[in-house]
Curated annotation (Swiss-Prot):
This is dCTP deaminase. DCTP binds at R79, S80, S81, L82, A83, R84, D95, Q124, Y138. The keyword Transmembrane does not apply. It comes from Pyrococcus furiosus (strain ATCC 43587 / DSM 3638 / JCM 8422 / Vc1). The lineage of its organism: Archaea, Methanobacteriati, Methanobacteriota, Thermococci, Thermococcales. Homotrimer. The gene is dcd. GO terms for biological process: dUMP biosynthetic process; dUTP biosynthetic process. Belongs to the dCTP deaminase family.
Length: 156
């Protein structure tokens, strides 16, 4: 069952919370302080924006910390305005028990650069209640992330 706006406000810890980001059946995550593009770490808060060049990907940290109960998971989709500009998002489930900021991957499939401003809404997360709490909620490598989390599979 998808959680409606009033249950999201009541049951999901989102910091910092923005009323503008709360949607009828989800929450719009915003561009956070760090990004990684073409091998470079970008201080988005300082620069005010991140630019994804044509045919390139970016890792972007969410502004929000999300903490999920053991019986709720998250499913994310790119906002349609960005999809209409040729931006594709590849996102994993947000497992029950997750706590931290999220590192998300966007790919600019267009022939034009795409600019995202610090604090701009870019991905919507919907929260889905499980039939019961997970026996083994997430406690993995990325738990508690507050900075960009790179793949544990290889060194950059």
């Amino acid at each position: 069952m998808l959680l409606p706006d009033w249950k999201i406000r009541k049951e999901i810890l989102i910091e910092p919370f923005s009323e503008e980001s709360l949607q009828p059946a989800g929450y719009d995550l915003r561009v956070g302080r760090e990004a990684f593009v073409k091998g470079k770490l970008i201080d988005v808060e300082k620069e005010g924006k991140v630019v994804i060049p044509p045919r390139e990907y970016a890792l972007i940290l969410t502004l929000e910390r999300i903490k999920l109960p053991d019986d709720v998971m998250g499913d994310m989709k790119i906002r349609s305005s960005l999809a209409r500009e040729g931006v594709i998002g590849s996102f994993a489930w947000v497992d029950p028990g997750w706590d931290g900021n999220l590192t998300l991957m966007l790919y600019n499939a267009s022939n034009e650069p795409v600019e995202l401003r610090y604090g701009e809404r870019f991905v919507q997360i919907a929260f889905i209640r499980l039939e019961g709490p997970a026996r083994n909620p997430y406690r993995g490598n990325y738990q508690g992330s507050t900075r960009l989390a790179f793949s544990k599979r290889k060194k950059l």
